[in-house]
């Protein structure tokens, strides 16, 4: 089966189930066998049977009461050819059962039926018309003409019998099936409707008579404004012991002491909240004239302050309006779902409903379209009620199942000790933000603009004309037609001017070097100089959003703006860090793990040479260069060290010889030799990486030191490129994922220490393996001590984790 089709089989089953169609399957039997069994059983019960299929093998099942209906595509459309037993005889001159013998003699490569060599359809049909069966034809070998057919059947009679067995459809398969199963109701069910919407089957949707299907839970969704009713609901919820809730943020702020920390912090007000604590108790509580937003928050705070478990779709979002103490009573359904399947882009409530509660329910877009919930509350009150209630009902409904799955997959501890505490850490980091000097940012942009203008002029002079440098079509024309440079790859839209093409040219053509530099500076200006300015808020700080449920490896990412991609290679790119300043009177303290992934590789592989090198604080890259290039340690050149560094880090990422050759601008053969020498020097690493691949093939996923799983569907793909990609991920994911776990542990520990020790200093940013703290001047030494203890103590490895710590009056100096 083609990989593309195999991937769709679960969706087909899901759709048929949603439409109320019974699925019959039996391990060890083909679909033809199940069709044959059901057809013959039904015929025996006096039923008229029709089988619709494009497979002519099924003609052997035709009888006076079993009709085989074969669709045939013609210019005028699809026509159906109907075959009862008499129609098979008329068309093929053999009976349905004899059709098996014809198929066995002629063979069929599509069904892996070998047949008899040298006998085609015409000869096979003639033999069976004359003798009735393969066995009878063999009994009359001397009569068979031509002689070649006689000889072939004689020599390959065993193969003919085996082929007949293969071609025969089993009509006594051991399946559980009854006529009741075959009854069809309304195919166009609510569940099927929702699935068609999810899969965007627009033509199918037009066949449904419903606009918005109802789920049974929706019957209990209610809108409550009465003060006494709201009070009664909270009393009842307290007795339930577990609630799902969703706060609806409004406009404005409240400045009460809502936080556990000493300083009062401004919090968003809410328009209301939804709450669910049974299949019948699901409602939206509206703040208004009878009950204020503050009173609702106080009720939910009091409720959660006891022993009541609180489940939400997005705990970090909830903390923006309702600061909650850090403990395991609070449950984040999206984070749990992410751990169980980190390959998805997002984790909306309708997906959790389907995956962990077996419910097909409308999505936010289905209900609200592009309207915000606050606006939809007025414009689409019924749709709003469904949305806001589902946001409470689904986390309540799925909590137990999600926790069960976390436990079954060995990730309960990962959730409890790393991911859940991280929600609180990230929430505080987002609230703190980081100060950006708007004037310095403006000056940085002006400096970039000036350099870009100089480059533009030089590029135009080199090209002999002005043109749009940002247009691939115009640039391709200049480089490959006017200037006749090599490596031109023509596509449908013109020549490729991708970075890999230009980098080859840049070695010999200064003009191309300037174009690459122009692109880098233009990117810096648009993304950082211009882009960051749009995110500076009234407090003068940027409050990025850390994304905890996005990357498959467990790494954090950030948006609005993305601070994970702050440049580090170009000096002019690094200069952007100068615009990030601590608040007045404070100092930045920056700590960065040193070679964390290589240290993890040393630990997980158990390679004694690498472990010993780290314990002796050797220069790892110089040592690798010495091994790979067979050069005494003290004679290793800077170039050899740089190449060895690329090999070291490339191995961690499962790099291929092609990838390494591209990185080092060497031949693929040379790169392969580097890799082979590396593994000769560090045999335990080769053994470890091969073991990672084999284990992933067996399990279908990779796993980190802390139990994080990364599913690897690619590793079993029939496509070589996909499978190779899966194997590289299998090597890298345990290492990169473990590094992600360690930095998260460090973040949680540093964050908690700063708070528990009553310090004014705060953790602001995490970028890859780096933490940035805004430290009070009298706390700098203590902050350094905390970073050293907590980052090094985040994992117990056979090689000590090391950090580089720096201070400065801006992020550039601290780095």
What are these regions (language model features)?
Residues 2-175:
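Extended two-metal-dependent nuclease catalytic cores across DNA- and RNA-processing enzymes
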């Amino acid at each position: 089966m083609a990989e593309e089709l195999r991937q769709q089989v679960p969706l087909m089953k899901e759709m048929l189930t949603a439409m109320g169609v019974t699925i019959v399957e039996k391990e060890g039997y083909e679909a033809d066998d199940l069709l044959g069994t059901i057809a013959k059983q039904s015929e025996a019960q006096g039923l008229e049977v029709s089988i619709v299929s494009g497979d002519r093998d099924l003609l052997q099942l035709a009888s006076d009461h079993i009709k085989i209906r074969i669709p045939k595509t013609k210019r005028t459309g699809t026509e159906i050819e109907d075959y009862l037993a008499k129609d098979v005889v008329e068309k093929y001159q053999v009976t349905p059962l004899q059709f098996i013998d014809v198929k066995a003699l002629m063979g069929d490569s599509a069904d892996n039926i070998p047949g008899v060599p040298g006998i085609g359809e015409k000869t096979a049909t003639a033999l069976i018309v004359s003798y009735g069966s393969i066995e009878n034809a063999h009994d009359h070998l001397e009569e068979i003409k031509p002689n070649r057919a006689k000889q072939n059947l004689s020599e390959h009679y065993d193969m003919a019998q085996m082929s007949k067995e293969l071609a025969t459809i089993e009509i006594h398969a051991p399946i559980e099936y009854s006529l009741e199963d075959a009854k069809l109701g309304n195919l166009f069910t609510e569940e099927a409707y929702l699935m068609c919407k999810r899969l965007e089957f627009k033509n199918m949707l037009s066949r449904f008579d419903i606009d918005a299907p109802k789920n049974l839970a929706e019957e209990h969704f209610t809108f409550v404004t009465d003060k006494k009713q709201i009070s009664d609901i909270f009393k009842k919820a307290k007795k339930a012991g577990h609630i799902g809730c969703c706060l609806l943020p409004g406009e404005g702020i409240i400045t009460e002491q809502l936080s556990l920390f000493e300083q009062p912090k401004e919090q968003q007000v809410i328009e209301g909240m939804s709450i669910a604590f049974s299949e019948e108790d699901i409602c939206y509580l509206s703040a208004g004239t009878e009950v204020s937003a503050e009173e609702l928050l106080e009720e939910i705070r009091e409720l959660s302050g006891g022993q009541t478990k609180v489940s939400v779709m997005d705990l970090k979002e909830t903390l923006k309006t309702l600061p909650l103490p850090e403990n395991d009573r609070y449950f984040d359904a999206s984070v749990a779902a992410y751990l169980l399947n980190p390959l998805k882009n997002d984790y909306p409530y309708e997906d959790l409903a389907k995956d962990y509660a077996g419910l097909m329910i409308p999505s936010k877009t289905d209900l609200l379209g592009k309207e915000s919930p606050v606006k939809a509350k007025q414009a689409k009150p019924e749709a709003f009620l469904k949305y806001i209630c589902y946001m409470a009902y689904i986390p309540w409904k799925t909590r137990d199942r999600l926790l069960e799955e976390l436990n079954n997959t060995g990730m309960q501890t990962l959730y409890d000790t790393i991911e859940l505490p991280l929600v609180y850490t990230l929430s505080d980091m987002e609230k703190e933000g980081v100060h950006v000097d708007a004037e310095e940012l403006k000056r940085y942009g002006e400096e970039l603009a000036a350099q870009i203008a100089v480059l533009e002029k030089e590029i135009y002079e080199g090209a002999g004309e002005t043109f749009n440098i940002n247009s691939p079509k115009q640039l391709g024309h200049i480089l490959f037609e006017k200037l006749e440079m090599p490596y031109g790859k023509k596509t449908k839209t013109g020549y490729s001017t991708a970075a890999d093409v230009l980098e080859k040219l840049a070695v010999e053509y200064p003009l191309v070097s300037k174009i690459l530099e122009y692109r880098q500076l233009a990117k810096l200006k648009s993304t950082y100089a211009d882009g960051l300015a749009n995110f500076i808020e009234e407090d003068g700080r940027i409050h990025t959003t850390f994304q905890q449920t996005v990357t498959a490896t467990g790494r954090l990412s950030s948006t609005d703006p993305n601070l994970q991609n702050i440049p580090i290679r170009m000096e002019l790119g690094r200069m952007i860090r100068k615009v990030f300043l601590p608040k007045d009177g404070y100092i930045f303290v920056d700590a960065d793990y040193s070679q964390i992934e290589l240290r993890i590789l040393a630990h997980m592989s158990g390679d004694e040479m690498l472990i010993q090198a780290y314990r002796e604080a050797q220069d790892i890259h110089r040592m690798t260069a010495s091994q790979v290039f067979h050069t005494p340690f003290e004679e290793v050149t800077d170039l050899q060290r740089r190449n060895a560094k690329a090999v070291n880090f490339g191995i961690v990422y499962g790099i291929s010889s092609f990838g390494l050759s591209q990185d080092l601008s060497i031949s693929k053969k040379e790169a392969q030799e580097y890799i082979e020498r590396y593994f000769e020097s560090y045999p335990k690493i080769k053994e470890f990486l091969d073991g990672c691949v084999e284990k992933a093939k067996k399990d279908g996923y990779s796993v980190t030191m802390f139990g994080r799983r990364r599913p690897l569907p690619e590793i079993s793909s029939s496509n070589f490129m996909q499978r190779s990609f899966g194997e590289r991920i299998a090597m890298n994911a345990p290492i990169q994922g473990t590094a992600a776990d360690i930095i998260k542990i460090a973040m949680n520990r540093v964050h908690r220490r700063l708070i528990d020790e009553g310090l004014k200093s705060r953790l602001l940013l995490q970028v890859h393996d780096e933490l940035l703290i805004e430290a009070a001047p009298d706390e700098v030494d203590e902050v350094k001590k905390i970073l050293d203890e907590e980052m090094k103590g985040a994992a117990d490895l056979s090689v000590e984790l090391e950090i580089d710590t720096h201070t400065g009056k801006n992020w550039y100096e601290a780095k």
